[in-house]
Amino acid sequence: MNGNNLSFNNLDWFSPEERFNQPGSFAIVEDHQIKAILAATPENPSTAWLRFYHVDRRSDHAKCFANLIGAAKNTLQKMGARGLFALAPYSWLESLLLAEGFKPADTIVTLQRDFPVQSTPENDDEIVIREMTQRDLVVVEEIDAAAFEPAWQLNPVSLERTYHRTAWHSVALLEREIVGYQMSTSIFDTAHLARLAVHPRYQHRGLGRRLAQDMLETFSAFGVTSFSVNTQSSNASSLALYQSLQYQRENHDILVMSLDI
């Protein structure tokens, strides 16, 4: 395929080449050329996501999408998946998804904070924040599965990839037990809180705030001045947390769509 095409890539820690080697990936080939290519691969046994879709503009992109998403659905059904989710940042993609029976499910919102934070001493000696190690991932996987609904969970492979691709990752401990974690990326003077979760048994005790504050303080110490985070518009507690840390909601929400399969 060349640059004359419609393209969508999901927010992902894996490359399109890696995704295309997973079940749920298909291509349409004509005259030895790829006309359209799609990956809709599982994240866990019950849930899959549309990872990417590329189609030559000169092709019937609606027909191509219908054929490819249909093939992916058949594969996912055989694997036991019950839901297929997709981000729809473009109107053309939203139209294609609606035509195949997808419905609006939620909205991803971005929040931004454009000034650093000063380190402040914490009075709660019960909570300990330390750097995450790879050995912690076994517990982090359990926390992630407990804290998120299936559509938003990351499987162990994805969590390990996230760990290796993020610049700062930390865990929160209560009585020497890991009960929460965060992973964040950074480039130049910007940082992004990519993942934060607290085990449901320990939520509403200030752990999420301590982890988010740790991210701000760590990157601020290295000269970072701009911070961002994404969450769902339906997640009121998450929105309240970030806004209490002076993040401001941006005006470029992304629609989340879902299909029962």
Question: What are the residue ranges of the model-derived segments?
Answer:
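Conserved acetyl-CoA-binding loop-helix of GNAT-fold acetyltransferases
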Residues: H61-N74, V198, H204-E217, A221, ...
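Active-site rim helix/loop that mediates acceptor-substrate recognition in acyltransferases
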Residues: N2-E30, F148-E175, M183
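A structural microfeature
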Residues: A36, D106-V109, G180, N251
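Conserved hydrophobic beta-strand within the GNAT/NAT acetyltransferase core sheet
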Residues: L84-L87, L193, F227-T231
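Acyl-donor-binding surface of acyltransferase catalytic domains
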Residues: D56-D124, D253-L259
